[in-house]
């Protein structure tokens, strides 16, 4: 079982879209005290808020913000018990060198390339994860094999942080809009203790 509880203090999705993944976690767990999300697209952000209300999530029990998660994170000072995400595959981002002084990216010594923000999202989520938290993120298979900066970041996550718990391969054509195969990566902060 991904989340070993029938109650979560909070759950966060940094690329929440319409909020369906957050609602799925709430349905699966049963009790989630607070739901957090961030979405870049204004229309989809409004849809996520409506979706929460339509699924009986009281407005005081969710905090969904509209902005660019990598450039202007809206929940940066919080740590979450559960993080779930299906970020857009291979999306571009600024990769501005100023981010090397950002706590989300600095420990790795390298930034995800501007042509693929996959590892920028992963390191953002690791930064936001509570010390006993669990994260589940859908990523393209390429994050397992690409070299250069992504290889450096991947090695640091596995060898230094020891956050990677499980990888589940997913078939091609599973997600609307992309035919490439994907994977579900599960990370647990508690993996650090199992070295």
Language-model segments: which ranges?
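Short, compositionally biased segments
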Residues: 3-6, 185-190
């Amino acid at each position: 079982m991904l989340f070993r509880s029938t109650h979560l203090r909070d759950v966060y999705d940094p690329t929440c879209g319409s909020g369906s993944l957050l609602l799925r976690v709430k349905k699966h767990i049963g009790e989630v005290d607070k739901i957090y999300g961030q979405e870049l697209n204004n229309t989809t952000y409004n849809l996520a808020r409506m979706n929460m209300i339509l699924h009986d999530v009281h407005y005081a029990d969710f905090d969904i913000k509209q902005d660019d998660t990598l450039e202007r994170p809206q929940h940066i000072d919080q740590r979450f018990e559960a993080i779930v995400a299906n970020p857009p595959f291979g999306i571009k981002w600024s990769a501005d060198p100023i981010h090397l002084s950002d706590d989300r990216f600095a420990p790795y010594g390298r930034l995800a390339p501007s042509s693929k923000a996959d590892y920028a999202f992963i390191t953002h989520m690791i930064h936001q994860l509570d010390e006993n938290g669990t994260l589940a993120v859908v990523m393209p298979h390429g994050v397992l094999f690409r070299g250069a900066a992504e290889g450096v970041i991947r090695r640091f996550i596995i060898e230094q942080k020891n956050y990677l718990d499980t990888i589940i391969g997913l078939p091609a054509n599973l997600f609307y809009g992309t035919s490439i195969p994907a994977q579900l990566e599960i990370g647990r902060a508690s993996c650090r203790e199992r070295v």
